[in-house]
Every structure is written in C-alpha cells, then in structure tokens.
Amino acid sequence: MSDDTKKQDTAADAEVEKEMEGVPEHLRDDRGSEEDASDDLSAALESLKSDLEAAKQETLYAKAETQNVRRRMEKDIQDARTYAATGFARDILSIADNLARAIDAIPQELREDEKFKGLVAGIEATQRELDKVFAQHGVSRIAAMGLPLDPNQHQAMMEVPTDEVEPGTIVQEMQAGYMIRDRLLRPSMVGVAKKPD
C-alpha cells in the first residue's frame, strides 16, 4: 500500500471514530452483528423448515388415520346391514328344528289318512315358507351327510365304527347347521365314521 492510501485510511478511520463517539459499544461492531444476525436467521430458518416437515408428516398421518377410520366405519355399517338378522335367525332355528321333527314324526299311515292330510300339508307348507324366508335373508343349511368333517362347519358329537365309508366322513346328522351368508350361524351336530376296533 502506498503512503497516500494509508493516510486516507487513517483519516477515514479517525472520522469514523469521531462519529462513533457516544454510540454504545455493542452497537459499534456492525460486521459481527451482521454475521450473528445471519447465523440467527439461518438457525431460525432451519428450525422453521424442520417444524414444517414435522407438521406435514403429522398432517399425512392424520389424513391416513381419518381414511382408515372411515373405511372401518363403512365396513362396520355394511356388516351391520348384512348380518343384522343374525340373532333373530339363530333364535328361529329352534322353530325350524321343531317343524322338521314334527314332519319326521308323522307316520306314513297318518299322512295318508284323510283326517290328517290337511294338518300334514299345513306343517309341510310352513316348513317350506320358513326355508324360503331363510333363503331371502341369506340363511342356508350346511350340507353334512357323506362329506368329510369340516371343523369350521361341523361339530363331531360321536364316532361311529364302520367299514362302509372313509374314517372322518359324516354318517349321521343329529342337528342341522346353518350359515348366514359367509358366517357360521350354528354348526351341524354330527356323527363321524371311524375304523372299527
């Protein structure tokens, strides 16, 4: 640097010093405070970005949870509509059982007797109507006889020794089982074949 430049810098520094008299010390260092302010702004900006990302994540989670709750509610409502008659149908099954027992208990000679033909026809018509109503509401009888035991639909009550069919095959149905659409309403109570001793 030349002497003239040094003199100018010194003169400028002296003027600046004179102007700065009376200014508090913490306000005099402009360069340091600008850097500190810049650092503070950068830190604040990073903090805000981090908070924004966290808020976005929370919003996404809340939206996903809301969708899941809505889907669960829709499924629950659909199930309630589909299976609303379950309790009532389960209670009516005993009536269906009693009608079937009544029909099975009528001897052949009474079926042909003119005095009882109307009664037998009425009981049989009632059974058919009940079966029709069951079908309208999705209640169906579970097939059992001659099929292999399915623990999801059948309940083995006893074992019957026999060589006529494969072991595990249903050979006797003591009580009919029913489904309501795709759900078990009541299992079939059955006797299952086993190998004789």
Curated annotation (Swiss-Prot):
Cell location: Cytoplasm
Keyword Nucleotidyltransferase: no
Keywords: Chaperone, Cytoplasm, Stress response
Region annotation Disordered: where it falls in the sequence: 1-48
Gene3D superfamilies xref list: 3.90.20.20, Head domain of nucleotide exchange factor GrpE
Single GO molecular function: protein homodimerization activity
A GO-annotated cellular component: cytoplasm
Basic and acidic residues compositional bias, start-end: 1-31
Cross-referenced Pfam families: GrpE (PF01025)
Gene Ontology biological process terms, A to Z: protein folding
PROSITE patterns linked: GRPE
Complexes and interactors: Homodimer.
Function recorded in the entry: Participates actively in the response to hyperosmotic and heat shock by preventing the aggregation of stress-denatured proteins, in association with DnaK and GrpE. It is the nucleotide exchange factor for DnaK and may function as a thermosensor. Unfolded proteins bind initially to DnaJ; upon interaction with the DnaJ-bound protein, DnaK hydrolyzes its bound ATP, resulting in the formation of a stable complex. GrpE releases ADP from DnaK; ATP binding to DnaK triggers the release of the substrate protein, thus completing the reaction cycle.
The family this protein is said to belong to: Belongs to the GrpE family.
NCBIfam families in alphabetical order: PRK14140.1
Protein name: Protein GrpE
